[in-house]
Amino acid sequence: VVAVYSQPLIVDSSITPTEIVQNTLVGSGITPTNIKFNKSLSNALITRDQIGVFTNGQGTNLGLASGVVLSTGQVQYAGGPNNQNGASHPTLIPIANDADLALLSSNSIQNIATVEFDFVSTGTEIGLDFIYASEDYPEYATSSFSDVMGIFLSGPDIAGPYSNNAKNIALLPSTSIPISTNSV
């Protein structure tokens, strides 16, 4: 019998949210501005334990080799195992409200991790690969604890029910159902 183990994600939270957006989240041909982390321009200029970049994804079942990780807890524990005291809570006081995320859940939002920015693209199309994971899944699926995910896009010719007429593009495949621990 040969046992093969996945290699853990490598997570780096020593980079500011602004640097993460500029150097990892957006690609060539996209210029981001007005970068905010948890509703604040100044929060985006210092390192935070709720956002980081990951590498070594090819050693896991994620389907992405590298990218950005957001957490309502501490991203350093994102690779698991899920056995760390305090991993579910950021070291700073979390922000607990977001009008758009609140529309995605019938339950109250307890804490959030948000990155917001404006961008201009030189192309006619943009793409984004994302993966949703929750420490609350599957233990709290169909309960009053419901982690939600939203990716809100607004701009010319976009008309949606969220702030700035945005649409949520974080939906279950081929549906209009928002992604949450209660919907996956």
Which residues does each predicted region cover?
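Aromatic (Trp/Tyr/Phe) and Gly/Pro-enriched flexible surface segments
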Residues: 4-184
